[in-house]
Amino acid sequence: MNSQSLDLGGRADDRASALPCAARTGADAPPLSAHGVTLGDFMDDMPVGALHRFVVWVIGIGLFFDMYEIFLVSTIGSALQNEYGLSRQSTDFKLLLASAFIGMFVGAMCLGSLADRIGRRNAFLLTLVWYSAFSLIGAFSVNADMLVACRFLTGIGVFAARYRYYPVADSFLSEILPKDKRGRLAAWAYTTSYVAVPLVGFLALWLNPLHVGGVAGWRIVLALGSLGAVYVLLVQHRLPESPRWLLAQGRTADAHAALRRFADGAGVRMPEQFAPPAEPQRPHGLRERIALLRRRPYRARYLMLVIFHLLQGFGYYGFGTLAGTVVKSRGFDVTDSTLFIALSFVGYPIGSLLSIPLLNRIERRTLVIASILSVAAFGLCFAYSGNTVLIVCFGVLTTCASNVFSNAYHVYQAEIFPARVRSTAIGSTYALSRIVSGALPFVLLPVLVDYGAGAMFGTISVALGIVAVTLRVLGPLTTRRSQDEINPV
């Protein structure tokens, strides 16, 4: 899943003497053909094993807490308005909606290449603990300013965790999963995460009106997000590092040891020797990574991702962040608007499930384009819906299409760069979507107040149309192709 220059030569048994023979080879494990095989070829053709499935599960649960944090404020926003006496036109309310996204942008700028420097595993674990801690502190906020600060700091960790944590997760999954199963298994991880979206909606519906032991219900919803740190403590010792990242750092023995864990879990033997590398393997500094991104074909791909991430947040986070405010602007009370949004959010895991069979059957670029245009169409229908049934119906269709889109593009963007620059490329461009998402309340709320929901979703649709055209013109084809084919340099 990597460029050819990252496939390591040398003997695969650098550490073999330290391991029992059965652990190295497996008594009944069938060997894979070793003639001329690179380490990348071996990983691409390996059957899915127990460790692959474990990593998919770990990534999915980690992303669960990430999605919980992102959609949190949209579900408790009405309760926060009542708690702090904020109107939807007030700067403080806009900052509450935007603060986590602004933090994500800062996190990306400061930590966007973190995973390329310290590894996929360490970046994932570190940042999950970070944003869990500030989520817990935010639950004890004494005023709106303190909550804004905590949401900002949470956002820094949330971006770093995706690299924010999604860009770590995207890289991790892209690098370890066999090419024929890459899309389907990655979609299972994302599907697990999206269960958090309706869950936080229904938790808010239940807890927002309550005081439990004198504690406001919305504070409990915030505090539950901190459980991600507990999860880290439970899994960190079993989570492997990406062999491809280790190869990119020139850590031959460590790469082979990590790969051996995947091979043992899949019941196959590692070859005695891999084909030699195209070039020496060593860590790449920031200047070298930037230089590679300026070369063909990555220059056009990087430009595509810049435009893509500047505008895609209008659809995905524009709806997720502001849908509750749109419903409330039509005269529904806090409970009713929270109920409608919680029901609409059921579409997120449904859409993610639908993407699983689609990702390997439909060219991923085509799937991204079709789904983002569907988001635009369903969002407009949501804006013009005149009764509660249609509001919920088109809300579900919008969120469903959103997650077909999200799963497809997360797999897609991780495939179109080699491993040594993957986190840097995705992290730096993804940061743009965070700052745009942070600005959305300041851009779209005035449109909603002055011109109505139709104008607001019309603005969103124009942005998504530009994304679709850019993908069609600049995006490469990737489905059922190896990383060496996709990334020739």
List PLM regions with ranges.
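Transmembrane-helix signature of 12-pass secondary carriers
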Residues: 2-489
